[in-house]
Structure formats: C-alpha cells, structure tokens
UniProtKB/Swiss-Prot annotation:
Belongs to the RuBisCO activase family. GO terms for molecular function: ATP binding; ATP hydrolysis activity; ribulose-1,5-bisphosphate carboxylase/oxygenase activator activity. Residues 452-465 have a biased composition (Basic and acidic residues). Residues 448-472 are annotated as: Disordered. Residues 1-58 form a transit peptide. One of its GO terms (cellular component) is thylakoid. This is Ribulose bisphosphate carboxylase/oxygenase activase, chloroplastic. InterPro entries: ATPase_AAA_core (IPR003959), P-loop_NTPase (IPR027417), RCA-like (IPR044960), RuBisCO_activase_AAA_helical (IPR048571). The keyword Chloroplast applies. The keyword Ligase does not apply. Activation of RuBisCO (ribulose-1,5-bisphosphate carboxylase/oxygenase; EC 4.1.1.39) involves the ATP-dependent carboxylation of the epsilon-amino group of lysine leading to a carbamate structure. Gene3D superfamilies: 1.10.8.1070, P-loop containing nucleotide triphosphate hydrolases (3.40.50.300). It comes from Spinacia oleracea.
Length: 472
C-alpha cells in the first residue's frame, strides 16, 4: 500500500508509488529538495474537468485579445511627447525626410512642458484657509528634494522666503507644514542674539539635531527660522554687528555645506545625522552676509501675492463672517497697495463697536472684575454684521492712520516746537477737528481792543490792534 504525502505548496495529492516501494516509504517533497525541483504531473489519469475548464479560459482570453482598439481606452500618452521620445531612437529608414516635419514635435518647447505639464494639481486648501499654489509648490518641492537621494546634484539646504511686510509669509509656511503633516522646529530672530557669546550658534545646532532625531525616528521634520535678518543681518547704522551675528552666519553656512555632519560641543562622532531642510523668512535678504545667500547654500523665493492670491486669502479671513465673495473682491480691489495683514486688522477693527458697547454697559470701573476675576468668564460677542459699506469705512480709517505715520515726523519737531506738526491736517481738511487753534490753522484773526479796562473793549478780538481808548 502506498501512502500519499502532501507537498509544500501543492493542492493535489502526490501520485501513487508504482515502483514496488514499501508501504512506509515516503515521497521526497519539493520543500525538502529545494525550489529548483521540477514537479511532474501524473499524465496516466488525466482530469477531464480540469482540461475542460482550462480550455474555456484560454478561449475567453483569446476572445478578449481580439479587440485591437481596447488599448485606446487606457492610452494616456501624448502624441507630441511620443514623437520627441522617438527622435534619434528610430531608424531614419522608417521616418519621412527631414524636412517633412513628421518626426518634428510641434509643441516640444520648454514652455509647453513647463506650462502644460507642470500643473498645480495639489489641494491648496487647508480647511477654510487658502494656500497660494506657487507658494505651496516652492515649499513642497524644496522639502521633498531634500529628503531624496539625487545623484551628483547639490541641493540647497536653505530656502529663503522673502518679500514685503505683512504678506503672510510665515502663515503660509505654517499652512504648508500642516498640509504635509510636519511639526517643524521653530526659531525666531530673538533667539539669534544672547548675552553669552556663541550661545545662538549652539542653539541652532541643537535645534537642527533635534529635527534630525525626529527624522531618524520616521517623522518628517524641518527647521523653521522666522525673520532671519533682524537677528543675523545689518539693519543700517542703528544696529551693532556682534560676535553672535558672525557665528550665526558661519554656523548656517557650515550646516548648509555639511548637512549630515552637524556636531554639538562635546559630542564628536562620525555617525551621520539626517538631512534637515531649513526654511527662513525675512523682508530684505540684502542685509545678510553675502556668502550665506549664494545659490549653492540658499534658494531664494520672492513672495509677492497676486490678485488671485489676495482674494483667496481674504476669502478665508472673512469666511466666518459670511461676507459674499463679490464683496471680498471689491474690498481687495479698493485697497490694492495694502498688505494681506491689512485686511485682518480691518476685520478686527469692526469689533471695536461691540467692545465699546460692552464697556459702556458694565462701566469702566468694572472692566477688570468682569474680565479677570469673574465666575462667568469673559463676555462672548455675537458676530457683527460686516457690510461692504462698513468695511470700506474702516479701511479708509486705517489708510488715514498709515498716512499720518508717514507724514508726521514728530521726532524731528519734538524739540523744535510744541505744535503737533501736520498730525491733524487730515481732520482739518475734513472739518472734523474742533480744537482749531489760531497758531496752527491759517484762519483770519479778529483784531480789536483786547484790554478789558478800555472803553472800546472787544471780547471777540484775538489780536490787539492798538485802538483801545480810555476814560481819563
């Protein structure tokens, strides 16, 4: 009697031993002899059902393959690029003459590839917040390529985002970090100076190593330095260039040149750390040390939001206030020269009326008790109605305050005179300034006798003209 032994990975039983072996003999398995053993099927007892099913499947496959147009439904190629890929790789015998134009791609220019193929097919919304596509593309590409191993390519470690004040550079960076799931290691300009020489440079290395440790543990991270140039740059003759400024610039240069070999004082080892992309923001990188911002170390990105970007950001600012989209567009177009931060301040200014009403209702003396030492907690205001007319009114008020700051130079007039200069010029022009002093405003001055003891005393006179008469 022959025994049936199951083989590794086989679903059928082993064939019977017909060579006169004993009943206790076992058949060697393919798992024992290795994967190179050929498995022989028993052809003496063919299975009619198995053969029939295999024949049917083969017939079905042949029937499916007969459709010569089936590949068109899955064809994602582009004719222009297919022609260019084949250029120089196909024998000229199978191509038309050189001047026929059949193997010349019509739209093979760099502009076609960069504009037609490089589309921002990324979700640039984080909740209700708008992320500028160009801004997100720059940060995502910079962070991604710093984690890739690109052969024979020197990738700048630092990305410098610079531009005008209040344009949302830091906030846009934070939105991109949140979109990527990155919790960056944060630094600010205030940490780049210290009473102890060398402390800021050491702190930069520590923060960089912290980010590298997070990356080594499998969590994406980056180093984010906010407002670099106030802490490491020269802001004219009003600031002093210290040893810490020099060491901060030198440390960033060294890290950019050796991103995987950042050592801490007292911890010198040859084990490479993870590469950490660095993103810095600022308003004017010309104040920084020139070798730091060269192309091999820092990639510069000038951020100037377009009209579409400004409308997108402002739509997120006023979304909770249910301001219609067409009103947001009109508001942005009404103040074209203002920064994005201007519209955030404009929204906050609308709440002044609500706060003023609450202060009048509780009394000025009870404000501290209601806000700090109250069981009920601070008051909760209902969202005021933000109409386009109200927003335009408060926006013009903010613009007038900006013009006052630019026009009035009180520091120059502080010692020369006691007048306010042109501080009230806009109010005077509008007729809303009531304290019209004669020495500040060019108004006609009433002349007459200003002596109360005189016979012809004129109480309305503001300047004595010498016409006083007296009773002797």
């Amino acid at each position: 009697m022959a025994t049936a032994v199951s083989t590794v990975g086989a679903a059928t039983r082993a064939p019977l031993n017909l060579n006169g072996s004993s009943a206790g003999a076992s058949v060697p398995t393919s798992g024992f002899l290795g994967s190179s053993l050929k498995k022989h099927t028993n052809v003496r007892f063919p299975s009619s059902s198995r053969t029939t099913s295999m024949t049917v499947k083969a017939a079905e496959n042949e029937e499916k393959n007969t459709d010569k147009w089936a590949h068109l439904a899955k064809d994602f190629s582009d004719d222009q690029l297919d022609i260019r890929r084949g250029k120089g790789m196909v024998d000229s015998l199978f191509q038309a003459p050189a001047d026929a134009g059949t193997h010349v791609p019509i739209q093979s220019s760099f502009e076609y590839e960069s504009q037609g193929l490089r589309k921002y097919d990324i979700d640039n919304m984080l909740g209700d917040f708008y992320i500028a596509p160009a801004f997100m593309d720059k940060l995502v590409v910079h962070i991604t390529k710093n984690f890739l191993n690109l052969p024979n390519i020197k990738i700048p470690l630092i990305l410098g985002v610079w531009g005008g004040k209040g344009q949302g550079k830091s906030f846009q960076c934070e939105l991109v970090f949140a979109k990527l799931g990155i919790n960056p290691i944060m630094m600010s300009a205030g940490e780049l100076e210290s009473g102890n020489a060398g402390e800021p440079a050491k702190l930069i290395r520590q923060r960089y190593r912290e980010a590298a440790d997070l990356i080594a543990k499998g969590k994406m991270c980056a180093l984010f330095i906010n407002d670099l140039e106030p802490g490491a740059g020269r802001m004219g003759g009003t600031t002093q260039y210290t040893v810490n400024n020099q060491m901060v610039n030198a440390t960033l240069m060294n890290i950019a040149d050796n991103p995987t070999n950042v050592q801490l004082p007292g911890m010198y080892n040859k084990q490479d750390n993870a590469r950490v992309p660095i993103i810095v923001t600022g308003n004017d990188f010309s104040t920084l040390y020139a070798p730091l911002i060269r192309d091999g170390r820092m990639e510069k990105f000038y951020w100037a939001p377009t009209r579409e970007d400004r409308i997108g950001v402002c739509t997120g600012i006023f979304k909770t206030d249910k301001v219609p989209a067409e009103h947001v567009v009109k508001l942005v177009d009404a103040f074209p020269g203002q920064s994005i931060d201007f519209f955030g301040a404009l929204r906050a200014r609308v709440y002044h009326d609500e706060v003023r009403k609450w202060v009048n209702s509780v009394g000025v003396d009870n404000v501290g008790k209601k806000l700090v030492n109250s069981k009920d907690g601070p008051p909760v205001f209902e969202q005021p109605e933000m109409t386009l007319q109200k927003l335009m009114e408060y926006g013009n008020m903010l613009v007038q305050e900006q013009e006052n700051v630019k026009r009035v130079q009180l520091a120059d007039q502080y010692m020369s005179s006691a007048a306010l200069g042109d501080a009230n010029k806009d109010a005077i022009d509008r007729g809303t300034f009531f304290g019209k002093a004669a020495q500040q405003v060019s108004l006609p001055v009433a002349q007459g006798c200003t002596d109360p003891e005189a016979k012809n005393y004129d109480p309305t006179a503001r300047s004595d003209d010498g016409s006083c008469t007296y009773n002797l």
